């Protein structure tokens, strides 16, 4: 383990090393997410420090470390991964991290005293199945357990440590060369290459850095004829061209998956070797048995964390903690621009995009962009017509799960909210309040152009399109545009031939419901007038006649 005085090469050296490791980790992360999504985890892109290394960093360097780790975690979260927030991230999100009072070892995310009890050692080996517990180091400054004393648990140290070991014990070495050596070692570690050249150079203390000087001066003279991208050597160009041809030359023995890049194949094999504990149900691998035990809850349905307030249970402790904020009202994540607060950091991150105008998830069909991937998935269903959420009681299908949940409540709950004027009942008070506006003579939303009033703001917004001429709904078949979505949907049926409204008496079908209702009256042979004016009581057989009459009031 590197001694504290071995890290005294100045803030700029550590900062650049951290930035270089950030770039390397991000490259590794992108490759993994693109080609082998199920094996990447936060542990694979983490930067770890020993206690001695941490105490040697100044506040600026610790701040940089915080930014690197939070950004790596954000990169995983923003591509749609459902992550259990690591304790190191929760720790870094606290303001007091820079004081150095807490030391977190990211590899295990457990704080240890110098003398570990037998039960604690069993916990590290994964023999205790109820999750990992945390101990706090003593105030007297006792350090972390040494990796040599406790086997291989802390053997995968940062490449920075390996580079430092190869350096002679002197203060006047070239820090820029150290940075180059460190980045080279990190890349070799990611690619699974042997580090023999570094071990051979320990006697002299010399580590080759010519490759980096060549990379800095060499021009990118190999250009892809398909997309114009340039590369510094022909082998990189050949690897890139396989992305256009679809050729995958390197196959993994264990899972049979193929890759275009030998380095990526070696990387995946390395990741597989680092995760020997496999789930028998789905085959997912983990580094430690304790992580596997937590994962098994998804298969067994075990939910050990139960809320005392409402009885809801959770698989993971962090989900339970977030849920507890719904009862306490705690919202620790506050937007600096508008002051809006959130219970989760992910909610704040999504909200910040609304200020920046950043909508990274775009629909390939119509080009509409969204803040989150889940909203994009919901939108795509409007193109495909997919409705995967089906009510088991009545068979009605929905494109969004929340709509199904609201629909199920209508089956489960009695309609206790009854209108005293007309007797109509509703399952929710909010629905009754909306209904009451139809009885109230006062219409709160008035058009400034013509003075027409409406019960709902959405109705006023739709009405304003008459004055502005806005027609946002355009038919792709004939180019005709409409100001109302319902008119657009009815028009589309003229192209598809769909007639969903069929008369049970004669079998005649109609495109729109209004035509169907008028037709139904013709079968009754009575002058039924279901549309009654609430002002004077006069009744009409068609809604258009009622609307025409209401204008005189």
Curated annotation (Swiss-Prot):
Q: Supply one GO BP term.
A: regulation of transcription by RNA polymerase II
Q: Which InterPro entries match?
A: KRAB, KRAB_dom_sf, Zinc_finger, Znf_C2H2_sf, Znf_C2H2_type
CDD domains, per this entry?
KRAB_A-box (cd07765)
* Pfam families registered for this protein in UniProt: KRAB, zf-C2H2, zf-H2C2_2
Give, as residue ranges, the zinc fingers classified C2H2-type. Answer: 222-244, 277-299, 305-327, 333-355, 361-383, 389-411, 417-439, 445-467, 473-495, 501-525, 531-553
Q: Where is the KRAB domain?
A: 40-111
GO CC terms for this protein? Answer: nucleus
Q: Which domain of life is it from?
A: Eukaryota
> What is the annotated localization of this protein?
Nucleus
**Keyword set, alphabetical order:** DNA-binding, Metal-binding, Nucleus, Repeat, Transcription, Transcription regulation, Zinc, Zinc-finger
Q: Which GO terms describe its molecular function?
A: DNA-binding transcription factor activity, RNA polymerase II-specific; RNA polymerase II cis-regulatory region sequence-specific DNA binding; zinc ion binding
Q: Where does the signal sequence lie?
A: none
What functional role does this protein have?
May be involved in transcriptional regulation.
**Protein name as catalogued:** Zinc finger protein 426
Q: Which organism is it from?
A: Rattus norvegicus (Rat)
What high-level taxonomic lineage is stated for the organism? Eukaryota, Metazoa, Chordata, Craniata, Vertebrata
